[in-house]
Amino acid sequence: MGFLRFFLTFLFGLGFLFPVSAGETVWYDYARSRAIPVKICFPSPVKKAPVILFSHGIGGSIESCAYLSNAWTAQGFVCVMVQHPGSDENIWKGKIRILNEFKGAYEENWSSRTRTEDLRFVLDCLERLVQSNEQFAARIDMDRIGVGGIDLGALAALLLAGQVPPDQGSSLYDPRIKAVLALSPPVRPMNISYRQVYQSITASALFITGTKDDGIVGPTKAEQRRIPFDAMRQSQRYLITLEGGDHRIYGGRVISFLGGKDDEKFQAGIVRSSSCFWRAVLREEPMAIRAMNSYDWASLVGVKASIERRSAQSTLVGSGSTMEIALPHLNRD
């Protein structure tokens, strides 16, 4: 317990001393005739830093989940927030029947193929910037890339990491991805087993869901959100299930009085756990690795939650276990 208190003091004390600068732009993918809004948040002082690519949920934008991008950037990560035309805020702004717009856009974008191709395009643009511009080369580490997202954004992140696409078309795997954060991942049955769907993912993964995390416009039920975690076999992975957490805790509520009294607590827990995960996997920080493998990891989350961990090819290691699991390819102190 003493170590975790010390680490949390470090994580949210010294870890937040980095000032933040941000810039917005639109990158045009001529091959697909798509304009992709992007917001890049850089930490200061200037030094090469790992990259976190983030994909919003249905109806979101580059401003979605600012609580995450602000926190991660303040801890020294480059955050790249990507907006997806066709499933972004423009589907509902100025509309009367908002729920119908959400449902229609969700079904049209269910496979997340277009979203995933957006993310790959943004990664390609970043690579070109690093190769052609010394200032970007000094700030962006393309060898340490993580990707995260909410719902359809989480699906896009998993597709980049090697999940079989829902449309069972060509693979969207991108070997540049080293870590995945899946917030409320959606699941639908296919004509192959879930083990086959997720078996190729090798990147370390953190899944976060809630006990009330039923889809609002999508069909996934709360108890199904854990399926990717259970089905994966080749990845070091973690699952946090927040007690009482619903589907709106991640990106905010359009109507603020519809619940949400504990949203700030849930979001603080998401920040704490995801920040520790990124620091362990992308920066290989010994204290973060120790915290991720702590017997009392629930203290890191800070809210009531169940915590589960599994290593590659392992059986379940649940909360309260006395087994310590080492993250693969990471240096231990």
Predicted feature locations:
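Primarily recognizes the serine-hydrolase "nucleophile elbow" in alpha/beta-hydrolase
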Residues: 122-200
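Serine-hydrolase catalytic machinery in alpha/beta-hydrolase-like enzymes
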Residues: 30-140
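Bacterial N-terminal signal peptides
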Residues: 6-15
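Structural recognition of the beta-strand scaffold that forms the well-ordered cores
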Residues: 38-40, 51-54, 78-83, 144-148, ...
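The feature captures the conserved acid-bearing segment of alpha/beta-hydrolase catalytic domains
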Residues: 170-244
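Alpha/beta-hydrolase-fold serine-hydrolase catalytic core, especially in secreted/extracellular enzymes
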Residues: 244-248, 252-333
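A domain-start/cap signature at the N-terminus of enzymes
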Residues: 20-42, 177, 308, 321, ...
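Active-site rim elements
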Residues: 105-110, 191-194, 257-268
